[in-house]
């Protein structure tokens, strides 16, 4: 009797796991980003997308001029926001902060960033406070800064100093916790969005 109950329990568990797997497969979502480089086709540059269940199948959506390089971007309030810079092959110079309508591909410059003293490494949107955050390394003071950006004007304010380490990625949970990954070791850090402390 015990073996029979165990067998039925295992069969039930198997069907439950099977239904969860099938459900997970049907929940595929589109992920948008900015394609900076493609081994197969170096002419594809700009907004791209892929499915969560097929991340290796990247599809270009809206191509953009390769003279303007994106180094940070994030989706917020119905638009994709991107920080662009120019390069002469040796040096990178801040260029602009743009808003892109993903349904039409139309790009609108929000702010001219040519006077900005540093480049953003990444951006993320905090849905809990409706705030865009970015990280940038200021070479003049050897410090990574946590920056808040105004989506309407492009104006930036320093939220805090993270420290001397450089960071390459930034993310924010729906609850408002900011995270960054350092360049040197690939460690994930929790960032205080009010002080910048890691």
Where are these regions (language model features)?
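Repeated scaffold domains used in trafficking and secretory/extracellular systems
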Residues: 66-78, 115-128, 164-175
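Conserved beta-propeller blade signature
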Residues: 28-38, 79-84, 131-135, 177-180, ...
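An edge-strand/N-cap motif at the start of beta-rich repeat modules
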Residues: 24-62, 73-75, 80
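Bacterial N-terminal signal peptides
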Residues: 9-19
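Short glycine/acidic-enriched loop and turn motifs that connect beta-strands
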Residues: 37-43, 86-92, 138-142, 185-187
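A short beta-strand motif characteristic of beta-propeller blades
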Residues: 55-66, 106-114, 154-161, 197-198
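A short loop-to-beta-strand structural motif that recurs across blades of beta-propeller domains
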Residues: 45-48, 95-98, 144-147, 186-190
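Short loop/turn segments that connect beta-strands within beta-propeller blades
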Residues: 51-55, 100-105, 149-154, 192-197
